[in-house]
């Protein structure tokens, strides 16, 4: 009897997040008490092919000055912790034009919505089915949630 062993490569990938990063599961939103910011669950979730991500910048007690500017980035990562996309701001308020990538953008206190078309940045290729992380950074303070693409 002859046995044949197939050589295989198994990769276990863990998304590395700082200890103070909030990762929510089963909740509708995650909050950062330092900046008063909130990151909501994307909708729809799971999604195919596009999704929206609602978030709030500033809040009581950090938003006593409505003209205060916050440096904001929203990025999407695969489970290998590789950045694959930057959503765009959708329907922004009067001080910011919508459609701009949410990378080091200065925003005032308020409610915002980001849009992701489900495509990998720099390509016209749709992201594969699976679990992804999206991370909001407000003045360097991160909040992370997960989302699922289902084809």
Predicted regions, residues:
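Short loop/turn motifs at secondary-structure boundaries
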Residues: 25-151
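Short, compositionally biased serine/threonine- and acidic-rich segments at solvent-exposed termini, linkers
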Residues: 2-34
């Amino acid at each position: 009897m002859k046995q044949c062993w197939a050589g295989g490569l198994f990769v276990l990938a863990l998304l590395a997040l700082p200890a103070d990063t909030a990762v929510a599961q089963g909740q509708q939103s995650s909050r950062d008490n330092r900046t008063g910011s909130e990151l909501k669950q994307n909708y729809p979730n799971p999604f195919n092919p596009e999704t929206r991500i609602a978030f709030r910048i500033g809040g009581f007690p950090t938003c006593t000055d409505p003209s205060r500017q916050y440096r904001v980035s929203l990025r999407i990562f695969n489970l290998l912790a590789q950045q694959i996309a930057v959503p765009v701001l959708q329907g922004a308020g009067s001080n910011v034009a919508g459609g701009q990538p949410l990378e080091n953008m200065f925003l005032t206190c308020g409610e915002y919505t980001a849009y992701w078309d489900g495509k990998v940045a720099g390509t016209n290729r749709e992201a594969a089915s699976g679990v992804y992380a999206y991370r909001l950074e407000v003045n360097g303070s991160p909040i992370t949630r997960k989302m699922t693409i289902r084809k």
